[in-house]
Amino acid sequence: MDLLGPIHDFLLVFLGSGLILGGLGVVLFPNPIYSAFSLGFVLACISLFYILSNSHFVAAAQLLIYVGAINVLIIFAVMFMNGSEYYRDFNLWTIGDGITSLVCTSIFLSLITTILDTSWYGVIWTTRLNQILEQDLISSSQQIGIHLSTDFFLPFELISIILLVALIGAIAVARQ
């Protein structure tokens, strides 16, 4: 969307804080149903981020595929599990949990360092100029294919990895 600067910045901060709060809800809610709804909220916030960056097709695909199908599938799977499995006593921290949290924290810190060291101003203008040039030369379906294989390759790969980890976690919970 082509919004004014302060409105665009406010929406980015608002959606970012909603994304962080929703992510914390996914991890911290003791009830898996609430966690699944919080995951749906996070995926909807990601879709709204795509709308703010003028990627309407990617936003629609995000809503239809991840919020509409995958999240509903997760909610159904959680609803069919026994409720008694949610409240079993277990050790809060094991060695694997400590190693996993250490790896996740190091990845998070490296991503924050990379984000802060990147010059985003040039990246944004380069992307907008490429979009203007591509709109004149090729059709919209070809533009979608080019954008999915170039500009939006990393977001789709990251989402697929996150989805894979979530499904492995769901299988591990279902086996117990």
Curated annotation (Swiss-Prot):
Belongs to the complex I subunit 6 family. The chain crosses the membrane at residues 10-30, 32-52, 61-81, 92-112, 152-172. It is found in: Plastid, Chloroplast thylakoid membrane. It is a multi-pass membrane protein. GO terms for cellular component: chloroplast thylakoid membrane. NDH is composed of at least 16 different subunits, 5 of which are encoded in the nucleus. One of its GO terms (molecular function) is quinone binding. Signal peptide: none annotated. Keywords: Chloroplast, Membrane, NAD, NADP, Plastid, Plastoquinone, Quinone, Thylakoid, Translocase, Transmembrane, Transmembrane helix, Transport. NDH shuttles electrons from NAD(P)H:plastoquinone, via FMN and iron-sulfur (Fe-S) centers, to quinones in the photosynthetic chain and possibly in a chloroplast respiratory chain. The immediate electron acceptor for the enzyme in this species is believed to be plastoquinone. Couples the redox reaction to proton translocation, and thus conserves the redox energy in a proton gradient. It catalyses: a plastoquinone + NADH + (n+1) H(+)(in) = a plastoquinol + NAD(+) + n H(+)(out); a plastoquinone + NADPH + (n+1) H(+)(in) = a plastoquinol + NADP(+) + n H(+)(out). This is NAD(P)H-quinone oxidoreductase subunit 6, chloroplastic. InterPro entries: NAD(P)H-Q_Oxidoreduct_6, NADH_UbQ/plastoQ_OxRdtase_su6, Nuo/plastoQ_OxRdtase_6_NuoJ. Its EC number is 7.1.1.-. It is an enzyme of class 7 (translocase). The gene is ndhG. The lineage of its organism: Eukaryota, Viridiplantae, Streptophyta, Embryophyta, Tracheophyta. Its main location: plastid.
